[in-house]
């Protein structure tokens, strides 16, 4: 479809088996969501400033029609990457956090030279937290709902932070590549540890239901 002459009208087009909708919203992201997501950006010192000063945003929806979930996600990231070249773009809001535009675009460009490259950190957030200062680390994801899958949690793991993240990344890719959520009670091996998947109320995200991965054997 041609680009609308009235910026208030959404732009709809199809590409790579997906329906794409881009809309302009002439106001800040509602509910201070950008400010909250800026807190998840320890690697970008300017995130809070970008969140607090933005005046409008572009909303993007990419719906798989004939594309697989992976193909659809790759298309979404490529379109977001192209939007970073628009004038006055200050941040990309994805995966429960904000990205510096050039960094997001740089990650997306890795897909130009590989049909299998999938910069998962641009579309799924992998976080770590503790109940108390001396408690074991727990891990969680945000963003798997776009793949019609519950987000993941690993609670109070004895493993190192890098291992916990690797386990969650592996579990996320299992769901994304097969296009289906882990089944309640399913057993799988991640980074040499056998886990059981169980659907429960989230400990990290109030009100959410997530897939908890519980280690049953090393």
Question: What would you call each of these model-derived segments?
Answer:
Residues 1, 79-87, 168-177:
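Hydrophobic, Leu/Ile/Phe/Ala-enriched alpha-helical segments that form helix-helix packing faces
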Residues 20-123:
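Internal, hydrophobic cores of structured domains that mediate oligomerization or house catalytic pockets
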Residues 1-34, 49-53, 179-205:
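Long, low-complexity, Ser/Thr/Gly/Pro-rich intrinsically disordered segments that act as flexible linkers
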Residues 97-218:
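Aromatic/basic-lined ligand-recognition segments
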């Amino acid at each position: 479809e041609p680009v609308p002459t009235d910026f208030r009208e959404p732009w709809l087009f199809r590409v790579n088996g997906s329906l794409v909708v881009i809309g302009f919203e002439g106001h800040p992201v509602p509910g201070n969501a950008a400010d909250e997501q800026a807190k998840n950006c320890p690697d970008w010192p300017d995130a809070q400033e970008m969140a607090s000063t933005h005046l409008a945003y572009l909303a993007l929806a990419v719906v798989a029609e004939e594309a697989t979930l992976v193909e659809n996600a790759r298309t979404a990231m490529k379109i977001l990457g192209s939007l970073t070249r628009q004038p006055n773009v200050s941040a990309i809001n994805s995966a429960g956090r904000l990205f510096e535009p050039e960094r997001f675009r740089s990650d997306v460009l890795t897909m130009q030279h590989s049909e299998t490259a999938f910069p998962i950190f641009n579309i799924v957030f992998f976080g770590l937290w503790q109940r108390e200062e001396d408690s074991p680390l727990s891990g969680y994801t945000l963003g798997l709902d776009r793949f019609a899958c519950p987000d993941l949690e690993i609670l109070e793991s004895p493993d190192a932070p890098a291992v916990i993240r690797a386990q969650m990344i592996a579990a996320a890719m299992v769901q994304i590549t097969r296009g289906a959520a882990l089944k309640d009670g399913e057993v799988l091996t991640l980074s040499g540890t056998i886990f059981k998947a169980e659907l429960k109320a989230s400990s990290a995200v109030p009100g959410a239901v997530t897939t908890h991965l519980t280690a049953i054997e090393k």
